[in-house]
Amino acid sequence: MNFNLLNKVIAGIVFIISFIVLFMTVQPSVSFWDCGEFIAASVSLQVPHPPGTPFFLLIGNIFSKLPIGENLGFRVNMISVISSALSILLLYLIAVKLIENYKGKKADNMFDAIATYVSAAIGALAFSFSDTFWFNGVEAEVYAFSTFLFAAVTYLIIRWNERADNKDSEKYILMIAYLVGLATGVHLMSVLAAVPVVMIIMFRKYVNDEESLKKTGYIFLGHIVIILLLAVFWWSSQKSQTAPTLEEYKDFDTKFKLFIAGISALIMGVYWKKIFTRNSFYMPLIIGGIALFATYPGVVKYLPELMTAIAGDNIVTEIIILALLFAGLGYGVHYSRKESKPTLHLVFMSFIFILVGFMTFAMVIIRSNQNPPMDENDPDTFTELVKYLNREQYGDFPTFKRRFATEPHQQIVYTGYSSDLDFFYTYQMNHMMTRYLLWNFAGR
């Protein structure tokens, strides 16, 4: 029997089931939260709240013109329905790939095929009808579309892993880079995929000593445990019942980050001969972190800031700077190919594709200059665009000390916790995160 065909049939069934249920439960018009804002912004290509979702709005504008239903809200809501159903399709295919990789072979008999495909289908459909995913899949929010982009990136890197030795395998990496660039115009959640993508590439192409990988993996595990234990001890000592000032917030955050960096530097310094090698578990993490940093905040925040610092609000100069950047990257592509440096060539090409995807943010400044009815923060110059991208209107918020509230009616709450750690565990973890997680599997 052709098990590949059976796999495709079940994948299609999973997609159809998910799509039908989501379609039957989709919001018929405008729902709560930011949905009305996104629908209105999509229909007329307006400027919503920072940091903007230009790629989502472009897709929403297309959907608003489709002859499906009479309600514009319903049309834009269908983005989430379709992207969520596609996410479930990709999740099924990913699960099949992972099961086959774990077994070390594809299904070669009916029992194996049923066990693999049915297990993957159950997992995918369970996710489809979980509280969070289902809720996001029936309204015009960015999370469903962002989940689809994340799923697409995950599926593409698995496909690349299977074909990494082929001459044209880099096309999967370039497609991933483009999707990551586009994802900046939807939600930054998908940008996080840059780290595991780079790690998989490193493990597949550069790591050739599994024993060294395991040893450094144990070092990394011990590294994390030491930091967590010391952090818990320090955090539990923060028992003040008086709200700190803004300067004290920032001072604690700075000390905490320096503490983590110092402990990390000490551990990595002791084991530097094992850590800074191609077969180290640390290297894929470090390079993956660099790739993430290059995308966000690198491309998303620092590139517009740099362009504004050089050219101010002169749009012609800004375009020239951007053209020079692409020219420099183009030369890097030419040089790396001429000198037969495939890794460097792939890095330059990937960065170009990320930049091209990020260019959807040009819509923000273009539409703001048209003065649409919804023009939040009025980002019609590069100076204002930088503020828009940096979300400056929201101000700063502490990274760690979040027990205290500024609202008078909430200030009495933080006295009910013995320490910052007590607040973190009792409220943030147990009440908020665990309860929310169980909504997906135990119901509300």
Q: What residue ranges belong to the model's regions?
A:
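Short hydrophobic alpha-helices at membrane interfaces in multi-pass membrane enzymes
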Residues: V118-A121, L156, R163-G181, E211-I226, ...
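Membrane-interface transmembrane helices that cradle and orient dolichyl/undecaprenyl
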Residues: A107-I114, V153-Y172, I201-S212, G269-N279
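Aromatic- and kink-enriched transmembrane "portal" helix at the membrane-lumen/periplasm boundary
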Residues: T25, L66-N77, Y102-A113, G123-T147, ...
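Specific aromatic-rich, kink-prone transmembrane helix
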Residues: V43, L90-I94, F133, F145-D165, ...
